[in-house]
Amino acid sequence: MSISLDDLASNMNFTTGGKSKAGGVTFLPEPERRKRDYTIISADDHIVEPPHTFEGRLPAKLADRAPKVIEKEDGSETWVYDGMEIPNVGFNAVVGRPVSEYSFEPARFDEMRRGAWDINARVADMDLNGIYASVNFPSFLPGF
């Protein structure tokens, strides 16, 4: 099924697409590696902070207050710090998934293409797409 930009603009329900009909998420097939004829630098990429981002990076006296990812009873994953829960928003990491599954709903790391949050997988994805470098913007962890 093909969805055009006009379809998306006329019906914003796609932002709550969520899971595939089979119950999990669908990842599109890996693209073929692109030949690089000239240098391409992506100037507007977004990355999700990996779950271990803050481990060992704060002074010892603040380590117990560092943001961390926990798994909740319902199986979802969320960032926790300073008494707040901040979920990973699925729309931050829709790369490699069909538009019908785009969602603002919380997402687990295993529901994201690894290149959305793992630097080595990100570089491999950039190589596949012929991207030499990119400017990355963080997701949403207020205060950091």
Q: What kind of region is each of these model predictions?
A:
Residues 1-144:
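Helix-coil boundary/capping segments in enzymes
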